[in-house]
Amino acid sequence: MADTPSVAVQAPPGYGKTELFHLPLIALASKGDVKYVSFLFVPYTVLLANCMIRLGRCGCLNVAPVRNFIEEGCDGVTDLYVGIYDDLASTNFTDRIAAWENIVECTFRTNNVKLGYLIVDEFHNFETEVYRQSQFGGITNLDFDAFEKAIFLSGTAPEAVADAALQRIGLTGLAKKSMDINELKRSEDLSRGLSSYPTRMFNLIKEKSEVPLGHVHKIWKKVESQPEEALKLLLALFEIEPESKAIVVASTTNEVEELACSWRKYFRVVWIHGKLGAAEKVSRTKEFVTDGSMRVLIGTKLVTEGIDIKQLMMVIMLDNRLNIIELIQGVGRLRDGGLCYLLSRKNSWAARNRKGELPPIKEGCITEQVREFYGLESKKGKKGQHVGCCGSRTDLSADTVELIERMDRLAEKQATASMSIVALPSSFQESNSSDRCRKYCSSDEDSNTCIHGSANASTNATTNSSTNATTTASTNVRTSATTTASINVRTSATTTESTNSSTNATTTASTNVRTSATTTASINVRTSATTTESTNSNTSATTTESTDSNTSATTTESTNSSTNATTTASINVRTSATTTESTNSNTNATTTESTNSSTNATTTEGTNSNTSATTTASTNSSTNATTTESTNASAKEDANKDGNAEDNRFHPVTDINKESYKRKGSQMVLLERKKLKAQFPNTSENMNVLQFLGFRSDEIKHLFLYGIDVYFCPEGVFTQYGLCKGCQKMFELCVCWAGQKVSYRRMAWEALAVERMLRNDEEYKEYLEDIEPYHGDPVGYLKYFSVKRGEIYSQIQRNYAWYLAITRRRETISVLDSTRGKQGSQVFRMSGRQIKELYYKVWSNLRESKTEVLQYFLNWDEKKCREEWEAKDDTVFVEALEKVGVFQRLRSMTSAGLQGPQYVKLQFSRHHRQLRSRYELSLGMHLRDQLALGVTPSKVPHWTAFLSMLIGLFCNKTFRQKLEYLLEQISEVWLLPHWLDLANVEVLAADNTRVPLYMLMVAVHKELDSDDVPDGRFDILLCRDSSREVGE
């Protein structure tokens, strides 16, 4: 395999295909002399998230998303970039690979960074995913020959599928016959590169001659309702294996969401389908794989390919159009065995396959269909035909067999219980139904009845429900029988005075429910305390008599619940009967010695549960009533005190250690906070000031103020320390609100940048003086700014209409349309090729002479700076500029002095990563242009030098005025981000060939030779007199 440039591997799911390339990648990464960068591509975003977790887990490889490479280029650290097929087919990716050597040399100034392996997982999708084949067309443009090796992996790619898939992406396909390695090395095709040589196939399934997936128990069931049957199976699994996980594959995205909505009350679910965004799919997949409390992953078939999930014990497929590949991939998720259920609705399995797709699986033996797909010998009608299917358990592991048996026993038990429920009276079925519902929905805060001297279905002579026992003075609850004595709850004991429910203890005058405490005249429910008089359950109050909240059906003599029996001294629950010594539950009756539960009755020696009645010797549960000798349960304040305690809630920006600030302390602050939230309502999202002004999203994309941060502000403007970072106020006066993502200070400096967009240097300097009262008050400045909101919006639309036309609508700039340019500059009469040659010549001279780039383009000063050209990365480059004082000179000579001292320096960080990506992509295009013209490829500047050039040109007053005069389609821009965007648009040269505007800028700059520029004429501030025609 190591001697073959392109290989395809088919191995069964769970075989360990990841390790086939994981170990070689680690070996490549360990080489010290050369840095290898490899790429892995998978079909779906869900699988991408799983691969990132698995490959980065060991720490041997530096793994990153391939989107980082597409947007920013190679970072020199990452060993493996992981992406999806759409990334592999993108033009940006293929361009970066085509220009790899040039980009590497410009970025790292070394040839020791090389392309390693190209790995494509589940590559059968190139052929079987019919609806996506149009998206794969861009892969044919990829330069496969640039890679050290190409590896194609799949668990479901027989020779015919593999050959067609490889040809579809532009490769030769599989080798038609096996070839000796010496013959391979002598092959002329190999000298032409990887793409021209056939791919060698390693079929590990045929070599083993074993049918895959025999370790999984596969069950095909036809049911009336797929969702109901699936829910039963899942509940049974989690009852047997509470820590296990399961996957459910649905047919449609709507079904996925419906199942997730209806099942989330039973267990924690994660759902995924193709309509979710890529980031959301990655986040949800990661959550399911890493969060042990997540039980079920529901999704369409994209959740079945390549995902490796620990504790996965069941896969359920509800898709009626499942083909053999999807079945194998789904079953293959059960790495260590488990259960796979194929649930289909009765009389609905027949389905036609769409053109070009594989047909759905047939009803019958699953193993035999798997053999047919892989080209293995059929065993139909022979011994060993069924492997893990059709009831055969021979090849299953002991754990899987045990799981099947436990599932069967549970199913039998549930079936027996169902038959018993059918035979019981309707009232009992009702009770069980409500109990099941209560498991998920009920709360323990409310009680239905109160008792005197007893607790929870336990009295001196009481009645317990659902039993057959006979006692002395009570009536059966929830039955229609009339008895002389009483009945014990779910026991067969007969007692004289009372019976303990759910315990084995017998007491003299009371019963402790679920406790072991003995009391004199009261009962503690769910506590172990011993009291003299009584203690309220779930409260801390002590009362004289006693009341048990969260109990039911307790009386002095007896209680009749949900029955029609008539007794002498009993209680009718859910009836309107009036008794002498009893308690009415859910009625309006008035009694002498009883307790009203959930009623408005007034009693003498009783307890009101969930009422507002006032009693003499009682405890109110979950109420705010005031009592004489009681305590309110579940209340936030003492009923016998007048104080109103208030929560101490601090705003997130408040330093709690320094300030004991309470929100009630300043009503003025709360009011101001509320007003600001209403005035700037979208600060909870990623809002920017252009949205606040009313610009559309497509306009914001090109006017957006990237690179604008606190360093844009001059010293002393919105930069005070020791205050709230969000609003620059003292902590006790902070007006930020919880959940605010975009601070008022950030909006203020963006608003300041908008004002800079509309003013030249002198006007902006005066503006900074005008807003001096707001230098320490960004909130006040925002209010001042918002007053002119409509006027500012209109002014930007007028002043930047030309800019939006060029950058957003991509209107063409032609030098031939500029009359002044044709008359006043030789550059405007040059061809595109001449402009490019001049550009490369300028950079060649700068490289040879080691000239300081920024200083040269600022004022044609050819000062030497060898450190700048020898710097190996961006940080060293910036340090070299700072060491020779470039940034200080720039601030003293130009409008850069109107920003913070670190502003220009920080432009070399990550502010302009999108622009950097576009520039590095253009290197590949320029390289191809040079090769097409027959010109010897010239070295082009790396990104940091290129950015230095544009900053120098931006701050060069003479050059700016000359360019704006000659090129009539552009006007002035006063923000560096806008200048950088403008420099990258394309211009039609005199011969109608396209060149980047920055190349035209360098040609104009070269034309303005230093001898033509008067010495010492650079103003400190960059100011343009629009009435003066420069250059005439």
UniProtKB/Swiss-Prot annotation:
Keywords (A to Z) from UniProt: ATP-binding, Helicase, Hydrolase, Isomerase, Nucleotide-binding
Start and end residues of each stretch annotated as Disordered: 455-658
Bridged cysteine pairs (disulfide): none
Binding, ATP: 11-18
Biased composition range(s): Low complexity: 455-634
Feature: compositional bias, Basic and acidic residues: 635-658
GO cellular component annotations of the record: cytoplasm
Pfam families for the chain: DEAD, Helicase_C
Motif (DEAH box): 121-124
Inducing or repressing factors: Induced in absence of telomerase TLC1.
Annotated InterPro entries: DEAD/DEAH_box_helicase_dom, Helicase_C-like, P-loop_NTPase, RLR_Helicase
Location of the Helicase C-terminal domain: 232-381
Record's function text: Catalyzes DNA unwinding and is involved in telomerase-independent telomere maintenance.
Protein name from the UniProt record: Y' element ATP-dependent helicase YPR204W
Organism lineage string: Eukaryota, Fungi, Dikarya, Ascomycota, Saccharomycotina
